[in-house]
Amino acid sequence: MKETFDHAYLEEHMRLNHFRNHYELTRKNLMVKNLKRLRRQLEKESGKLEAQKCDFFPSTYELPSEYHIFVDEYRRNPGSIWIMKPIAKSQGKGIFLFKRLKDITDWKKGTEYQPASDPSKEAPETYVVSRYIENPYLIGGRKFDIRIYCLITSYSPLKVWIYRNGFARFSNTRFSLESIDDNYVHLTNVAIQKTAPDYDPERGCKWSTQQLRKYLTARHGQEKTDQLFNKMNEVFILCIS
């Protein structure tokens, strides 16, 4: 324990629940940076086919530092939809979708982007911008994401435990690209969905992992459902390796 972790500020009764540099996983921009680095490493050492294992997330850039790189990619895909997220916020705060570069120009004029002329002032808030998935898999016509918890007990050797009781979070409103500014359609954060005018607190907007697997098995069969969850486990390993 003492050889592996920083312990200068730990008292006798304290226990650790974070590894050193855990933010390399929990900060959105650092996670993307590390996955891009892993992809380059795999391509160099094992070839393009092996590197394709990292192609599970859409094109993503850090703003403002990669703004000009993003603009080049945006112009290569006219009419596409993108999603902006602050790197260190939760509950859907600060997230928005856009289709026109002008919307980013307006954002740049906001206080979040303004560079600090005074070194004593805080630096502009960092965002990630990702290509929005315009044809997501829907259940009941609604978007959802899956929240799975992993307990990492060791990195050398790597030991990871997957918590079985994860859950899927659903949007409250049926999916449509007609109104990309409607967070009740496009975001699955419970903090946002529970404020929807027609939100039903008894029904909620969550399924357990077991409910999700049962639905997918009934819809697509046991083999394909098992393949999906095995692929998810592979993604977990890539993210933490």
What are the functions of these language-model segments?
Residues I69, N77-S241:
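Catalytic core of tubulin tyrosine ligase-like
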Residues M1-I83, I87-S90, L97-G110:
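Conserved N-proximal alpha/beta basic substrate-recognition cap immediately N-terminal to
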